[in-house]
Amino acid sequence: MASHKKSEDPLVVKDRQEQECESSDSTIASENASEHRSPMGLIDEDGIETLNRIASQSSRRRSSVYPPNVPTRTSTLATISENDPAVDPQGPSFDLNKWLKMVLRESERQGREAHRTGIVFKNFTVSGTGAALQLQDTVSSMLSAPFRIGEMMKNRHSPPKRILNEFNGLLKSGELLLVLGRPGSGCSTFLKSLCGELHGLSMSKESVIHYDGVPQQRMIKEFKGEVVYNQEVDKHFPHLTVGQTLEFAALARTPAQRIRDMSREEFAKHITQVVMAVFGLSHTYNTKVGNDFVRGVSGGERKRVSIAEMALAHSPLAAWDNSTRGLDSATALKFVEALRLFADLSGSAHAVAIYQASQSIYDIFNKVVVLYEGRQIYYGPAKDAKSYFERQGWECPQRQTTGDFLTSVTNPSERKARPGMENQVPRTAEDFEAYWRKSPEYQKLMSEISHYEQEHPLEEEGDALATFQQKKREIQAKHTRPQSPYLLSVPMQIKLNTKRAYQRVWNDISSTVSTVISQIIMALIIGSVFYGTPDATAGFTAKGATLFFAVLLNALIAMNEINSLYSQRPIVEKHNSYAFYHPATEAIAGVVSDIPVKFVIAVVFNLILYFLAGLHRSAGQFFLYLLVTFIVMFVMSAVFRTMAAITQTVSQAMGLAGILILALIVYTGFVLPVPSMHPWFEWIHYLNPIYYAFEMLIANEFHGRDFICSQFIPAYPNLSGNSFVCSSAGAKAGQRAISGDDYIQVNYQYSYGHVWRNFGILIAFLVGFMMIYFIATELNSSTSSTAEVLVFRRGHEPAYLRTDSKKPDAESAVELSAMKPTTESGEGDMSIIPPQKDIFTWRDVCYDIEIKGEPRRLLDHVSGWVKPGTLTALMGVSGAGKTTLLDVLAHRTSMGVITGDMFVNGRGLDQSFQRSTGYVQQQDLHLETATVRESLRFSALLRQPPNVSIQEKYDYVEDVIRMLKMEDFAEAVVGVPGQGLNVEQRKLLTIGVELAAKPKLLLFLDEPTSGLDSQSSWAICAFLRRLADSGQAVLCTIHQPSAILFQQFDQLLFLARGGKTVYFGPIGQNSNTLLNYFESNGARKCADDENPAEWMLEIVNAGTNSEGENWFDVWKRSSECQGVQTEIDRIHREQQSKTQASDKDNESWSKSEFAMPFWFQLYQVTYRVFQQYWRMPEYIASKWVLGILSGLFIGFSFFQAKSSLQGMQTIVYSLFMLCSIFSSLVQQVMPLFVTQRSLYEVRERPSKTYSWKAFLIANIIVEIPYQIMMGILTYACYYYAVVGVQDSERQGLVLLLCIQFFIYASTFAHMAIAAMPDTETASAIVVLLFAMSLTFCGVMQTPTALPGFWIFMYRVSPFTYWVSAMAATQLHDRVVQCSPSEMSIFDPPSGQTCGEYMSSFMSMAGGQLSNPNATSDCNYCSVAVADDFLSSVNIYWSERWRNFGLMWVYIVFNIFLATMLYYTFRVKKWNLSGLKERFSKKK
């Protein structure tokens, strides 16, 4: 079969393939270094017994049940040799058993005991705020907001809602607590509350919670690092290696007293190596942690890094929130085993929430708590929980794990009462809670709490607090404040953070180098533009412009720090919660690490610019210039860092920074000199650090110098006396040179005497903003607990919510979903699924890719089929290639070479194959602003064929909604997690979108149960079962099914590592067929109570059967394998005879790539994007606010520009300032386009929903109306303020030009982002192109003064034509009246009037005399009308409409280039391997 190269998001493909390859690499590594597999794998049986003995003795000493005089550890501890290589974690014979014995012995010898604590909570009630009903905001609701103030105020003060209701419990030192509950039941809130993470939450006054007698408030304030919470999301610095990440954590929590008197560094390195060995991370020591964009360790390894990092915090009490998500069952079990070991030996206590806990995991826990809609319905010994609920009247199905059973009783659709108990069992969460409170187990718990509190009474200043403080002081470093929760002193924290900051810089050196290179390029461009500027009066403006660019480019480079600070804020907050360091110390370290980087950038940039632009070549002037630019770089860095620290979101910070930059540029003193400033905004320049820096640079350049006059007035030969004057400001009659000091005083009101005063002001700004930054970083936290709630369209909210009545069993707590999970109603009508007859087969499919220059086979001769009415499971060990096979079969791979055969009914696949199949991806990608019904309708409209009417498609969508039981939230908005659909609802929508397309071949599903709890997983699989029973063909990858879940499937395709088949065939009743195959080929017998899926994973993971044969080889020689090939041949013969007869009836569209014609696609996609924009009021408001504020600010800064020469110049500069918001306009558009593109390229394009042309054109079209509105608003705010009311033609043209400018900005944004992978990359290109366009538009350097090389850039820059058209329209025929400082004043020769003396000069040069009849003090203005001024900068009134037309050419060019770039780089798949081969042959 020919190689298939279909499109998919390359990041998704790369991440998946790297993980699969790394998994196979890890397997090889683990075979060679088995000691790194797991904590349990490191200990022999004798060692386990010894440790268990030690652990049980420790547990007895801590337990209130056993007397305290139990014998201590055995004397075998003393027999360990300190030089034993078994305690070296890097050695091949490392033994965790012996290492732990050594540590225990050392601790005993030093008289230290591990710090231990338990936790007691009584009447523990936690509440949050959030409206029960949330409606979607739109542009119309935004505009009508002033008329709905009452409604908004009412919603703002919604009453608090209970999330946890009167919990009671006791977790002792050394115990493990399993937290069970369905998503939204309050598990995360419970774990956070145990650790004092109460952002956005509140505890009731009656709540009691303490740690062995220490109140929670005191605990969090002084002992924050003793109780830590591990969140579900992995947050790490991506560029740090695993070793650096974990060694940092170890150093931050290294105690003052250490084993063997190791130094801090030695201890941290040693303990890190041990933890890495325990969690199987030793082979990743020098590998970057990475993230979605930075290549690093695999997702499972990153999760283990998070676990290891928190383990290094050495906390006696830890809460783990679904920390096994993304880990396979074996790794998850080993993680819990490690917690068990740590708890037994160190006395630490752990509370762990796990969604799908296998029986082997469950059995490790001491206690379990079951949550039901925020209510506690059991808390007690894990071994007694099952019997408690069975006694309550519930039946546990055979082979169901205890964890699944306990969670299932909270699901009305899954729980099953024992015969005869149907009317006696509790039904609602309140009933369950009431039953629990009356039970003997509850009474026993309360009695245990009472006894425990007698031993550990709650006291503000008691023995427990004193013990905590003493133990903390023992491990705290010197000079650390006693009340501080941190182990390190502030200087030590700064030192540690600074080291890490430099590691981050070095590991991401390419970013620093690219910044330096971009600055070199900008310096070369700006320097060359002003190259050859004369040291004469003709160079005055050019020198000012050079220094203006210098100070701005040095200052504004720091704006990028806002994004970097926001990206690291979640990591810093996590470390702070672990009591690693003060956030302020990390902020200080960030500033310190920036010094050398900024120094290099400053030196490189300014060295090039200074000498290339011909600034004053004097050592004193150069070094002062360098000092000023370096200081202003740091001052502005402090300003932008402060912006990031005082705001809550990056959009707030960037919006604030955008307005700030505009104010800083305008009030620097160049485009609007101090004499021209208006009183209402004049105060800004006093608060502007750049103003003070610019005054220093100007004074430094011009001070103490006389500049030769370039042009005299009048320009007669043999001038003498006072009959002439230089044409520049500050000139005096009869002088042939102008003092630089006089020029800057007249033109700018600057003085050299202010230089060192300004330097002091800059230092004050630096210190002030740095202090605010450090304080704000320490105090401001963006972490908050948000309500998980559904959002509805206005006017479409469900009746029971609209009337505030409570739906039966509705979950009302903030953390809970706004309604019952969707899988609890009836079976759903499956009759709407059209019967299918097509059979999909594949034979000997192989998939090869190249990794690091080496060929790698990911799939190895896989064969199989999917028939209508069957549910086929695709399983395998981690990294076996399950998702890869699904992608290959669905034609969704974007790289590599596929060989083998794929057939539908025995015939090859045509281009309609992709749209004839449904593919439910693992990621639930949907348009956030659309409702569930709209998402389904969009899929049906574009993917069902044209012979189906629109009404029929809509009717089918309603059937799908009923079938998936989504009626209650059909009008709910998809939203984002927490504010929109929950995990299960998103998964159902993902399935629904594919069903709405009515796929006529089969349905692929990739991990449909990923991230779901066991009940939701069961509901999804039961639905797939019903789907298959109705005639649908289904192929589904599944990670780790329970025994009951496994029985839902008909067939199984099982892959071993490397994509090798080890079984394909029926599963059989109770998995008998599958078990018989493996057992007959040398596998051990599967026990009756064992999960066949786990059993099979275990034996295949072992690699070989009892005779040492590889399972892949066993399969290849088996009769079952031969039977597969025979069955494929039979299917082909049978189906080919059937399909020949039906081929004649096929419509032409049935073979086409897309179901619907292009114009229908374009209409539907454009309508959807319009709808999306309308429902994004924040985005639209940010656009309009930017336009309005910019227009008003520029308009009133340059208000009623005078008719003087400076007035003409300020009008042109005002246009320059309008152009300066161009970059912000582009930056607004690009992120939204990237979001749209991700959805299209990952889900909609591979499904052949619509064409890439429709996608691109629709996105360009939809921006235009909003850009037109933005142009109108900006025009109204800017134009009339600056120039007042002009004739209608001019007003109309300026309006058109304003609209045109914003349309150009949006098309430019699409052109820039079309081919780029992300906004960051595109932004760098945008900034460069924008800077060049702005520099060469003729405002800062006139075209006549440009070096010849750059003239082409003046002609290429679109701003040249836009500024020219705008300036000409506003200034044409305007009479100029020079201000007194602009007048050239001189005396005519005796006997002549001024008019007579100047007549010949004025006949050639133009201009005007204000006193032609005077015989002294002639007042000459060099310009009579504004057109004379404009012609000097190559701007002409006659070219205004031509320039307007040229701008449309640029807009069309942007659209054309966007289309070509998108097609070339993101649609067209180039055969690069073929090109390589051809090139190598030529060589």
From Swiss-Prot:
The keyword Aminoacyl-tRNA synthetase does not apply. Keywords: ATP-binding, Cell membrane, Glycoprotein, Membrane, Nucleotide-binding, Repeat, Transmembrane, Transmembrane helix, Transport. Induction: Expression is highly up-regulated in azole resistant strains and in the presence of miconazole. ATP binds at G876, V877, S878, G879, A880, G881, K882, T883. Disruption phenotype: Leads to slight miconazole susceptibility. InterPro entries: AAA+_ATPase, ABC2_TM, ABC_trans_N, ABC_transporter-like_ATP-bd, ABC_transporter-like_CS, ABCG_dom, ABCG_PDR_1, ABCG_PDR_2. Residues 147-398, 840-1083 form the ABC transporter domain. GO terms for cellular component: plasma membrane. GO terms for molecular function: ABC-type transporter activity; ATP binding; ATP hydrolysis activity. Its main location: membrane. It is found in: Cell membrane. Residues 1-19 have a biased composition (Basic and acidic residues). Pfam families: ABC2_membrane (PF01061), ABC2_membrane_7 (PF19055), ABC_tran (PF00005), ABC_trans_N (PF14510), PDR_CDR (PF06422). Residues 71-82 have a biased composition (Polar residues). The chain crosses the membrane at residues 512-532, 539-559, 595-615, 620-640, 654-674, 759-779, 1179-1199, 1215-1235, 1254-1274, 1293-1313, 1320-1340, 1444-1464. Belongs to the ABC transporter superfamily. ABCG family. PDR (TC 3.A.1.205) subfamily. Pleiotropic ABC efflux transporter involved in the basal level of azole susceptibility. Confers resistance to miconazole and clotrimazole. This is ABC multidrug transporter atrA. It comes from Aspergillus oryzae (strain ATCC 42149 / RIB 40).
